[in-house]
Amino acid sequence: MTSKIFSPKISAVIESLRKLPTIGKKSSQRLALYLLDKSPETAIAIANSLLDATANIKKCVYCQALTEDDVCNICSNTNRDNTKLCIIESMLDMIAIEEAGIYRGKYFVLNGRISPLDGIGPSELKLDILQQIIADRKIDEVILAISPTVEGETTAHFISQMIAKDIKISRIGFGVPFGGELEYLDQQTLLHAFNARTNI
């Protein structure tokens, strides 16, 4: 509940902002008051860009990354190595890997991890699409770049079991602590993690 000093419309903005990751009560209040009082033009610009994006952004038919086109820039890039497939949890992981400049293959974005307690199973992660991609392409290595959490370990194990035995499966390792999230690793640690990946 927001404070009674706020009107219903201001409270609605505050509550909406609180739904964002890492935004707590105080931060949502500060953001709402800044946007409404100090920079209403910014609020309108943000609202318009979000409306436009939600109407036009979809998931790439291959890797499940967010894109405006049916196929994203990475999947449509013929200079990428089509024989390597890196499986990641989110687009934030893709950004981290791309910015580190350590990988030139293709991706598959799970958009989550298997977590039965949260109602997330293989179908929610589109693993049927992943299986089809692996079957259709001449992939010689699948790289599991999944965070070493309990859910991440479950997800990595499930995926490794569904991949054909003649395909090399590796897992990034060095420098990624248990419970750590890939997106928060610095580029040097990520480089070591990729170079020190182990076969499953």
UniProtKB/Swiss-Prot annotation:
Question: Which SMART domains does the record match to this protein?
Answer: TOPRIM
Q: Name one GO biological process term.
A: DNA recombination
Task: From the record, give the transmembrane residue ranges.
Answer: none
Q: Which UniProt keywords apply?
A: DNA damage, DNA recombination, DNA repair, Metal-binding, Zinc, Zinc-finger
Q: State the PROSITE patterns in the record.
A: RECR, TOPRIM
Location of the Toprim domain: 83-177
Q: Name one GO molecular function term.
A: zinc ion binding
**Zinc finger residue extent: C4-type:** 60-75
Q: Would you say which domain of life the source belongs to?
A: Bacteria
The function of this protein is:
May play a role in DNA repair. It seems to be involved in an RecBC-independent recombinational process of DNA repair. It may act with RecF and RecO.
HAMAP family on file: RecR
Family classification: Belongs to the RecR family.
Q: What's the name of the protein?
A: Recombination protein RecR
Where does this protein come from, organism-wise? Francisella tularensis subsp. tularensis (strain SCHU S4 / Schu 4)
